Amino acid sequence: MDIVMNPDRSQWAALCQRNIPNDDAIEQSVREIMDNVKQNGDTALRDYIARFDHFTGPLAPLSEAEIAEGASKVSPEVADAIRRAADNIAKFHSAQLHPDVDIETMPGIRCVQRAVPIQRVGLYIPGGQAPLFSTVLMLAIPARIAGCAEVILATPASDEHPIAPEILFAAKLCGVGRIFRMGGAQAIAAMAFGTESVPRVHKIFAPGNRFVTKAKQLASRFTAIDMPAGPSEVLVMADESARPDFIAADLLSQAEHGPDSQAVAICSSEAQARQVCDAVARFSAMLPRSESIASSLSHSHIIVMDSIDTAIDFVNLYAPEHLIISTRNPWQVADRITAAGSVFL
């Protein structure tokens, strides 16, 4: 990671640039997959799953017995952690429920706002570098609380590597109805258009790679989607009270998502910045996805800024997906943040 010392505001735009690849090259191939699945259903879907996922098993969803068998392989410690996380997520989203708005704006004119559940939703869970069972929880639990009539889940598997037990455990815990072994653009196409084996859904929720994101964008003409997802990113805003090893761990937690991820830290001194840089190098050498992390860190930065006010201005310009505030008075800082996806104090 490079260290940038007190950059002039004229340099900020360049520091805010993301490493977003040009997806024009993949659009044609994704469009062909979408069109083929739309026209030929299971025949096309089976071909793509065999070609890309290396899975030659049935297109039918897993049976209850298969789900139970896979889920039973989760260790008691991990199972307890998943249950605890599920409880916390459910508490938060239950608090988001609100009563109808019902108001008479003038005599005889009644206006009502009412939230109704989407009937059938499709969840896509990536299965590449790590089993993202947390994504199962964060998508399936709100769907259950909202009252969606049916939740189906798609995640890739291969003949040699079945669906991770943690994903099956989380899906079973959350009451997911059907689980399909399919990944990539072909999974998005199947849920968007429906096939003989896969039902068409009314909305797709799907983090994923460039191919999944492009497929969602094309599918949005036919069914609702959550939003296009870019590469994961984090900005850690720290003052002298923050521990350099903690900052490094937070940076790497996003950098390991993929080679296009970006991790940025704002430090209060050059000494702290160099300590963070050293810790990042030390920790990354211990992690299994070192090549992907190295690619991510090649377009990441540690920025030294001389005041908290300047740092806040930069954060609001950068508008990070994930913002971690590691300062003495984090709530006071958070109150001044106007552009960030999720904020952690």
What spans do the regions from the language model cover?
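Conserved small-residue-rich beta-alpha loop and adjacent elements
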Residues: 103-169
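Conserved NAD(P)+-binding/catalytic subdomain of aldehyde/semialdehyde dehydrogenases
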Residues: 173-262
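Flexible, acidic loop-helix segments that line cofactor/substrate-binding pockets
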Residues: 61-75, 228-235, 257-273, 278-304
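Short acidic-hydrophobic, aromatic-tinged amphipathic segments that line or gate anion-handling sites
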Residues: 1-7, 178-183, 302-307
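Glycine-rich phosphate/diphosphate-binding loop of Rossmann-like nucleotide-binding domains
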Residues: 134, 145-162, 238-246, 250-288
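N-terminal Rossmann-like NAD(P)+-binding subdomain of aldehyde/semialdehyde dehydrogenases
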Residues: 1-119
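C-terminal core of ALDH-fold dehydrogenases
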Residues: 317-345
